[in-house]
UniProtKB/Swiss-Prot annotation, chain A:
Protein name per Swiss-Prot or TrEMBL: Enhancer of yellow 2 transcription factor
Residues annotated as transmembrane: none
Subcellular location: Nucleus, Nucleoplasm; Cytoplasm
Oligomeric form and interacting partners: Component of the nuclear pore complex (NPC)-associated AMEX complex (anchoring and mRNA export complex), composed of at least e(y)2 and xmas-2. Component of the SAGA transcription coactivator-HAT complexes, at least composed of Ada2b, e(y)2, Pcaf/Gcn5, Taf10 and Nipped-A/Trrap. Within the SAGA complex, e(y)2, Sgf11, and not/nonstop form an additional subcomplex of SAGA called the DUB module (deubiquitination module). Component of the THO complex, composed of at least e(y)2, HPR1, THO2, THOC5, THOC6 and THOC7. Interacts with e(y)1. Interacts with su(Hw) (via zinc fingers).
HAMAP family on file: ENY2_Sus1
Gene: e(y)2
Pfam families on file: EnY2 (PF10163)
InterPro entries: TF_ENY2, TF_EnY2_sf
The entry's keywords: Activator, Chromatin regulator, Cytoplasm, mRNA transport, Nucleus, Protein transport, Transcription, Transcription regulation, Translocation, Transport
Family that this chain belongs to: Belongs to the ENY2 family.
Species name: Drosophila persimilis
GO CC, alphabetical: cytoplasm; DUBm complex; nuclear periphery; nuclear pore; nucleoplasm; SAGA complex; transcription export complex 2
Biological processes annotated in GO: heterochromatin boundary formation; mRNA export from nucleus; poly(A)+ mRNA export from nucleus; positive regulation of transcription by RNA polymerase II; protein transport; transcription elongation by RNA polymerase II
GO MF, any single term: transcription coactivator activity
Domain of life: Eukaryota
From Swiss-Prot, chain B:
Annotated compartments: Nucleus, Nucleoplasm; Cytoplasm
Function: Component of the transcription regulatory histone acetylation (HAT) complex SAGA, a multiprotein complex that activates transcription by remodeling chromatin and mediating histone acetylation and deubiquitination. Within the SAGA complex, participates in a subcomplex that specifically deubiquitinates histone H2B. The SAGA complex is recruited to specific gene promoters by activators, where it is required for transcription. Required for nuclear receptor-mediated transactivation. Binds independently on SAGA to promoters in an RNA-dependent manner.
Originating organism: Drosophila persimilis
Subunit comment: Component of some SAGA transcription coactivator-HAT complexes, at least composed of Ada2b, not/nonstop, Pcaf/Gcn5, Sgf11 and Spt3. Within the SAGA complex, Sgf11, e(y)2, and not/nonstop form an additional subcomplex of SAGA called the DUB module (deubiquitination module). Interacts directly with not/nonstop. Interacts with the AMEX complex component xmas-2. Interacts with Cbp80; important for promoter recruitment of Sgf11 that is not associated with the DUB module.
Predominant subcellular localization, coarse grouping: nucleus
Any one Pfam family match given in the protein's UniProt record, by short name: Sgf11
Name of this protein: SAGA-associated factor 11 homolog
Claim: Nucleus is one of the keywords in the record: yes
UniProt biased composition (Polar residues): 142-153
Region (Disordered): 140-196
Length: 100, 196
């Protein structure tokens, strides 16, 4: 988790996290992933909504893996490449002020 | 789990050392391409998780408000479908004009429904104009001589034809003049009113 923490903090600090997040959400909206997941949630709710013990947490655990697999490969690849380029850029950028 | 946005300003504002530490951590990480890949994947996963959570919140909100079912909409009933058959209107009713005729209870003539009310008014001598005509007719009947009456009948034959024929024209079976006697009488009534 330390790797992730470092990355997370760093991207937040540089403001790249917001950029990537915006890109991802716009891509997901474009390809209809949002609607698909929303539909999935609704169909599950229609099945199990009547059960009073059905909680939001249960819904989340049920939908999240499926939602993850629903993401188109193209979007995932684009995002990963984008993240990598941002990492590379930051690597170059930050060395200079550090040294100076 | 991705940390929330709240601690970011705190981290950034704390001191240059923490900033430096974060940058250092990151730089160390970038040296190892394997770790970098892992980091990229993790970042992607966390962002995706954020997106899913956003949808959950949205759906949850809609559900609590009661708008979730509204999104589904209501299935269109076949009864309300627009009918697309030739010669039928959108409700599936024939477009052919149905002529509705009414039989006048006073003179037993068939009159088109649209003309029935004016006809009845005239035929039964009711209404503003008709009653005026009727009262004048009563007044004239007392005072008129036989010679003047005959002249009215003659002049009425010319003018009366058009007036009474309205009813006949509008009647759907297009009956022609029922009787000359009838039109003459009607015409004379009308004409009486006009001349006075």
């Amino acid at each position: 988790m330390t790797i992730f923490n470092a990355v997370d903090k760093f991207t937040m600090m540089s403001g790249d996290r917001v950029k990537i997040k915006d890109l991802l959400s716009s891509r997901l909206t474009e390809c209809g992933w949002r609607d698909e997941v929303r539909l999935l949630c609704r169909s599950i709710l229609q099945e199990k909504g009547a059960i009073s013990s059905f909680t939001v947490e249960q819904l989340v655990t049920e939908v999240t893996p499926r939602a993850r697999s629903l993401v188109p490969d193209a979007v995932k690849k684009e995002l990963l490449i984008k993240i990598r380029t941002i990492f590379d850029e930051n690597e170059d950028d930050d060395i200079d002020p550090e040294d100076a | 789990m991705p940390t929330s946005a709240a601690p970011v300003p705190a981290v950034a504002a704390q001191s240059p050392t923490t900033r430096k530490a974060i940058a250092n951590n990151f730089r160390e990480l970038t040296k190892d391409p394997k770790k970098l890949d892992e980091a990229a994947n993790q970042l992607y996963e966390s962002l995706l998780e954020d997106a899913v959570t956003g949808i959950f919140i949205e759906v949850h909100h809609l559900r609590k408000i009661g708008n979730l079912s509204a999104l589904d909409g209501v299935a269109e009933e076949s009864a309300h479908r627009i009918c697309d058959v030739p010669n039928l209107d959108i409700f599936g009713v024939s477009t052919a004009k149905k002529a509705i005729d009414c039989t006048c209870p006073n003179c037993d003539r068939l009159v088109a429904a649209a003309r029935f009310a004016p006809h009845l008014e005239k035929c039964m001598g009711m209404g503003r104009i008709s009653s005026r005509i009727a009262s004048r007719r009563l007044a004239t009947k007392e005072g008129t001589s036989a010679s003047s009456n005959s002249s009215y009948v003659h002049s009425g034959a010319n003018a009366g034809g058009t007036d009474d024929e309205d009813d006949v024209d509008w009647s759907s079976d297009k009956r022609k003049k029922k009787s000359t006697q009838n039109s003459r009488n009607n015409g004379s009534k009308k004409n009486n009113g006009k001349t006075f």
